């Protein structure tokens, strides 16, 4: 289930960034007293009453046709489009302004749940200022103070009441869920269309957790697959494509709902820092990962090109050394027949369990081959290991002292496990615990 998205929206200078920082608990947004200073949408994960959600801080919506104001308004509209719930921020000291009324019109058109917050109510005597805000038509206004942090509990209680119940679309355990992530113009949509284009069975679009996230379900060789958030990839337009924060948020939510993540790279443009960042999200989430190099038809090649490109990938993504690499072309369908079998293999590995007795034979052989490290005259002792979880495969090593488990030795044990059992395409976690 993907976390809901909450957007804080309002005209400039009502204190959106201060409230964002209060809820998230970190000072992420730049807070200045100049209208229009939060130019890009900033988002972070937040929690309230066991509800985890993404919070987006938007630039102030100002009615005007200066290029920057137009851009801020477009960014805020994207945030509204993405949100499950909107916090409409106003400033109690200013009363209801014409700009507030314009924002209210925009929010009414969105048909999203709106919780009205009246900021800068810094003491009880100021509470009477909230009554004018009923006129905006969003029900009860919640008095809050960004300066003192008061009133936020009631506000967040109201917000979480609007969260989707039951977490949206759930799929059967044996359905393989995967998503395609990558920066703009790497060919994600073309790849999806190429995968589905060969399909001879009925392709159905299934509504996901957000209003416009559509998942696409299909069957190939008896296996049901779901491509998560095909709607997000099909969204077009300069603003969507150029807004990195928009695409990152969308990618994070797709990753959360997937078993396997296809990180798509562009063969023509090579690898850039943004690719690394995007791939990092999939790795940190513990999902199965496949690196897809698209547009392979578009570059000149000799017999060394693929090997050199693969070496570059391994240099740029050392944390994904377990991920297989597939060179494809959505345009010419080159190697596309290998893609779904690889997704299936990685999904199986991601959910694989190994027998404890076989695992411990491997671990004891590894320890005999490469003795455990010592620290301050004390040697690490590994008594036994057991697998405690899948998706990703997670192992607990029972040892004399977890502090003695150096990351390099942990890495050595991981490599021995991979040599013995495969686990291609999936991260592995090893946790050292003291034997009771």
From Swiss-Prot:
<dbReference type="InterPro" id="IPR005225">
    <property type="entry name" value="Small_GTP-bd"/>
</dbReference>
<protein>
    <recommendedName>
        <fullName>GTPase Der</fullName>
    </recommendedName>
</protein>
<dbReference type="InterPro" id="IPR031166">
    <property type="entry name" value="G_ENGA"/>
</dbReference>
<feature type="binding site">
    <location>
        <begin position="229"/>
        <end position="233"/>
    </location>
    <ligand>
        <name>GTP 2</name>
    </ligand>
</feature>
<dbReference type="GO" id="GO:0042254">
    <property type="term" value="P:ribosome biogenesis"/>
</dbReference>
<feature type="domain" description="EngA-type G 1">
    <location>
        <begin position="4"/>
        <end position="167"/>
    </location>
</feature>
<keyword id="KW-0342">GTP-binding</keyword>
<dbReference type="InterPro" id="IPR032859">
    <property type="entry name" value="KH_dom-like"/>
</dbReference>
<dbReference type="Pfam" id="PF14714">
    <property type="entry name" value="KH_dom-like"/>
</dbReference>
<feature type="binding site">
    <location>
        <begin position="294"/>
        <end position="297"/>
    </location>
    <ligand>
        <name>GTP 2</name>
    </ligand>
</feature>
<comment type="subunit">
    <text>Associates with the 50S ribosomal subunit.</text>
</comment>
<feature type="binding site">
    <location>
        <begin position="119"/>
        <end position="122"/>
    </location>
    <ligand>
        <name>GTP 1</name>
    </ligand>
</feature>
<comment type="similarity">
    <text>Belongs to the TRAFAC class TrmE-Era-EngA-EngB-Septin-like GTPase superfamily. EngA (Der) GTPase family.</text>
</comment>
<dbReference type="InterPro" id="IPR016484">
    <property type="entry name" value="GTPase_Der"/>
</dbReference>
<feature type="binding site">
    <location>
        <begin position="182"/>
        <end position="189"/>
    </location>
    <ligand>
        <name>GTP 2</name>
    </ligand>
</feature>
<feature type="binding site">
    <location>
        <begin position="57"/>
        <end position="61"/>
    </location>
    <ligand>
        <name>GTP 1</name>
    </ligand>
</feature>
<dbReference type="GO" id="GO:0005525">
    <property type="term" value="F:GTP binding"/>
</dbReference>
<dbReference type="InterPro" id="IPR006073">
    <property type="entry name" value="GTP-bd"/>
</dbReference>
<dbReference type="InterPro" id="IPR015946">
    <property type="entry name" value="KH_dom-like_a/b"/>
</dbReference>
<feature type="domain" description="EngA-type G 2">
    <location>
        <begin position="176"/>
        <end position="351"/>
    </location>
</feature>
<dbReference type="InterPro" id="IPR027417">
    <property type="entry name" value="P-loop_NTPase"/>
</dbReference>
<feature type="domain" description="KH-like">
    <location>
        <begin position="352"/>
        <end position="436"/>
    </location>
</feature>
<dbReference type="Pfam" id="PF01926">
    <property type="entry name" value="MMR_HSR1"/>
</dbReference>
<comment type="function">
    <text>GTPase that plays an essential role in the late steps of ribosome biogenesis.</text>
</comment>
<keyword id="KW-0677">Repeat</keyword>
<keyword id="KW-0690">Ribosome biogenesis</keyword>
<dbReference type="GO" id="GO:0043022">
    <property type="term" value="F:ribosome binding"/>
</dbReference>
<feature type="binding site">
    <location>
        <begin position="10"/>
        <end position="17"/>
    </location>
    <ligand>
        <name>GTP 1</name>
    </ligand>
</feature>
<keyword id="KW-0547">Nucleotide-binding</keyword>
């Amino acid at each position: 289930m993907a976390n809901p998205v909450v957007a804080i929206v309002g005209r400039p200078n009502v204190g959106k960034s201060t409230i964002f920082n209060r809820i998230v608990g970190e000072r992420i947004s730049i807070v200045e007293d100049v209208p229009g200073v939060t130019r890009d949408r900033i988002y972070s994960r937040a929690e309230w009453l066991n509800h985890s959600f993404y919070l987006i801080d938007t630039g102030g919506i100002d009615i005007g046709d200066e290029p920057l104001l137009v851009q801020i308004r477009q960014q805020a509209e994207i945030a509204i489009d993405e949100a499950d719930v909107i916090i409409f921020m106003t400033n109690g000291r200013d009363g209801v302004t014409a700009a507030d009324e314009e924002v209210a019109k925009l929010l009414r058109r969105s048909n999203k749940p709106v919780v009205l917050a009246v900021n800068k109510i810094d003491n009880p005597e100021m509470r009477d200022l909230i009554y004018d805000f009923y006129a905006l038509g969003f029900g009860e206004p919640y008095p809050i103070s960004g300066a003192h942090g008061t009133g936020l509990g009631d506000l967040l209680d109201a917000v979480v009441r609007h969260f989707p119940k039951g977490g949206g679309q759930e799929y059967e355990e044996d359905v393989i869920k995967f998503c395609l992530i990558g920066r703009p113009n790497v060919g994600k949509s073309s790849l999806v269309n190429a995968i589905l284009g060969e399909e001879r069975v009925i392709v159905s679009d299934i509504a996901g957790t957000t209003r416009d996230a559509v998942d696409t379900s299909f069957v190939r060789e008896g296996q049901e697959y779901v491509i998560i958030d095909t709607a997000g990839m099909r969204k077009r337009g300069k603003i969507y494509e150029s807004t990195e924060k928009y695409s990152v948020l969308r990618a994070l939510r797709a990753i959360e709902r997937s078993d396997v993540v296809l990180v798509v790279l562009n063969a023509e443009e090579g690898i850039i820092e943004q690719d690394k960042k995007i791939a990092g999200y999939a790795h940190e989430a513990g999902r199965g990962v496949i690196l897809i190099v698209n547009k392979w038809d578009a570059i000149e090649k000799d017999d060394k090109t693929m090997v050199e490109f693969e070496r570059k990938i391994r240099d740029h993504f050392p944390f994904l050394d377990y991920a297989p690499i597939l060179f494809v072309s959505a345009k010419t369908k080159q190697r596309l027949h290998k893609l779904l079998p690889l997704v299936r293999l990685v999904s199986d590995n991601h959910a694989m369990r190994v027998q404890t007795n076989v695992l411990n034979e491997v671990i004891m052989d590894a320890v005999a081959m490469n003795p455990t490290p010592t620290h301050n005259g004390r040697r690490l002792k590994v008594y036994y290991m057991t697998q405690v979880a899948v998706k990703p495969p997670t192992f607990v090593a029972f040892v004399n002292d977890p502090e003695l488990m150096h990351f390099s030795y942990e890495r050595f044990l991981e490599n021995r496990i991979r040599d013995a059992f495969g686990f291609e395409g999936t991260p592995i976690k090893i946790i050292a615990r003291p034997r009771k």
